[in-house]
Amino acid sequence: MDSRIPYDDYPVVFLPAYENPPAWIPPHERVYHPDYNNELTQFLPRIVTLKKPPGAQLGFNIRGGKASQLGIFISKVIPDSDAHRAGLQEGDQVLAVNDVDFQDIEHSKAVEILKTAREISMRVRFFPYNYHRQKERTVH
């Protein structure tokens, strides 16, 4: 009796799309080139604090939520708004707002929390990879 698994019974594995490596740059020039930047502090979580006067806008939009399984992300920041000056940027993942965990929250609940708060303390991190994955899911 042959104990090998039939070929059709093997699991199917989908690999991510191939990304071409950056163009070759001489080692002495790499320290100044963004494709060879090893500075990772931009991806660390940070706290952004905003105060919203009654009736005022926050200065940013969000997308995503529990249904997307990728989290809540900043999708737009209005130039010269308080949010822009505080350092929010498109692609920031909202981890928490006023100590409420935003990593597994419904979009409508996230909007409600952001709209009703007057003082907002947000823990965010720049996470463009998941942000772009989320955008791709909602475009199709």
From Swiss-Prot:
Q: Which CDD domains match?
A: PDZ_PDZD11-like (cd06752)
Single GO MF annotation:
protein-macromolecule adaptor activity
Q: Which Gene3D superfamilies match?
A: 2.30.42.10
GO cellular component annotations, sorted alphabetically? adherens junction; basolateral plasma membrane; cell-cell junction; cytosol; pore complex; presynapse
SMART domains tied to this protein = PDZ
Q: Using the chain's own numbering, where are the disulfide bonds? A: none
* Subunit structure, as described in the record: Interacts with ATP2B1, ATP2B2, ATP2B3, ATP2B4 and ATP7A. Interacts with PLEKHA7 (via WW domains) at zonula adherens; this interaction is essential for the interaction between PLEKHA7 and the ADAM10-binding protein TSPAN33. Interacts with SLC5A6.
Function recorded in the entry: Mediates docking of ADAM10 to zonula adherens by interacting with PLEKHA7 which is required for PLEKHA7 to interact with the ADAM10-binding protein TSPAN33.
Q: What is this protein called?
A: PDZ domain-containing protein 11
Q: Which organism is it from?
A: Bos taurus
The beginning of the lineage is:
Eukaryota, Metazoa, Chordata, Craniata, Vertebrata
Gene transcribed to yield this protein: PDZD11
